[in-house]
């Protein structure tokens, strides 16, 4: 039953009660509260589904739409190359920048090749290598985040996935060059944070950002994996909720029915925001950038009664 049908049914019930001289205001208030809760759950889950939509533009799509002459660079110089993590150099309105991002697949073959966008330690070490290179040559860094999380496999653990992410968190906060991070789909846990420390952090309107997936939270905390929708609402993962928590700097709008309906329009909105921030950040002293970036990151999650 749609929200409109539910509203009409309640209005009819209210009219019948009034004609019969009955006071059902208390019961109606309880029903309305349940409907509002149900609507909130539905809206949150709609965002989750849009963030995971199979046709949603990926990192490479935005790279091709926003940057000129992109040249991909490979390898972490420790173990190997990770196809789940894209990195390279491109130009935006003539300005050279380093672009880094997690890459999901579009079909089964690509998803397998890209490991579903879940990077291994070598992916995060490659990202760090390119970030250090960007600092050396005074290039701004743009990161695109779209991942369920870092890969949780045995090999990843053996090669130090936790250390790789922790190292990135520390080093990205110290880089003396502008960093802009954009969550374009799923921003999952430490996998997102590994390339998510920046001077400016944005989410696309229908992206999500969370410490754990709704399914994982439902299984662990609620002891019922079928309650993923409830968990999603509890986690406060939508762009507006994350903005309200002051974790991000802003929301980049999408077409009404999602980024996949008009990738070019979405890319144009992202490009506009990047150029606006670069015009400001590139004028700042590198030491000042680091100072305010560190302060920003340390203030996330700060709470006082």
Swiss-Prot record:
This is Acetyl-coenzyme A carboxylase carboxyl transferase subunit alpha. GO terms for molecular function: acetyl-CoA carboxylase activity; ATP binding; carboxyl- or carbamoyltransferase activity. Pathway: Lipid metabolism; malonyl-CoA biosynthesis; malonyl-CoA from acetyl-CoA: step 1/1. It comes from the Bacteria. Its EC number is 2.1.3.15. It is an enzyme of class 2 (transferase). GO terms for cellular component: acetyl-CoA carboxylase complex. Keywords: ATP-binding, Cytoplasm, Fatty acid biosynthesis, Fatty acid metabolism, Lipid biosynthesis, Lipid metabolism, Nucleotide-binding, Transferase. It catalyses: N(6)-carboxybiotinyl-L-lysyl-[protein] + acetyl-CoA = N(6)-biotinyl-L-lysyl-[protein] + malonyl-CoA. InterPro entries: Acetyl_CoA_COase_a_su, ClpP/crotonase-like_dom_sf, COA_CT_C. Acetyl-CoA carboxylase is a heterohexamer composed of biotin carboxyl carrier protein (AccB), biotin carboxylase (AccC) and two subunits each of ACCase subunit alpha (AccA) and ACCase subunit beta (AccD). The gene is accA. Component of the acetyl coenzyme A carboxylase (ACC) complex. First, biotin carboxylase catalyzes the carboxylation of biotin on its carrier protein (BCCP) and then the CO(2) group is transferred by the carboxyltransferase to acetyl-CoA to form malonyl-CoA. Belongs to the AccA family. The lineage of its organism: Bacteria, Pseudomonadati, Spirochaetota, Spirochaetia, Spirochaetales.
């Amino acid at each position: 039953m749609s929200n409109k049908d539910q509203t009409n049914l309640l209005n009819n019930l209210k009219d019948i009660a009034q004609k019969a001289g009955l006071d059902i205001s208390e019961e109606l208030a309880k029903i309305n509260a349940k409907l509002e809760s149900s609507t909130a759950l539905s809206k949150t889950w709609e965002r989750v589904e849009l963030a995971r939509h199979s046709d949603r533009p990926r990192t490479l799509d935005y790279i091709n739409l926003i940057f000129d002459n992109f040249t991909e660079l490979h390898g972490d110089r420790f173990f190997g190359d990770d196809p789940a993590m894209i990195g390279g150099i491109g130009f935006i309105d003539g300005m050279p920048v380093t672009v880094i991002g997690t890459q999901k697949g579009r079909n089964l073959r690509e998803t397998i090749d890209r490991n579903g966008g879940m990077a291994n330690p070598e992916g995060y070490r490659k990202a760090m290598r390119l970030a250090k290179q960007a600092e050396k040559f005074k290039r701004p860094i743009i990161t695109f985040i779209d991942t369920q999380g870092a890969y949780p496999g045995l090999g990843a653990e053996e090669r130090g996935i936790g250390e790789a992410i922790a190292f990135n968190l520390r080093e990205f906060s110290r880089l003396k060059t502008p960093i802009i991070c954009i969550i374009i789909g799923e921003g999952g846990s430490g996998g997102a944070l590994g390339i998510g420390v920046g001077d400016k952090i944005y989410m696309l309107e229908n992206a999500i950002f969370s410490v754990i997936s709704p399914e994982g939270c439902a299984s662990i905390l609620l002891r019922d994996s079928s309650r993923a929708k409830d968990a999603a609402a509890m986690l406060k993962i939508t762009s507006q909720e994350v903005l309200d928590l002051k974790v991000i700097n802003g929301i980049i709008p999408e077409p009404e029915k999602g980024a996949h309906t008009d990738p070019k329009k979405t890319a144009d909105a992202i490009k506009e925001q990047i150029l606006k921030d670069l015009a400001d950040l590139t004028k700042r002293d590198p030491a000042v950038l680091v100072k305010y970036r560190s302060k920003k990151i340390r203030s996330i999650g700060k709470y006082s009664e």
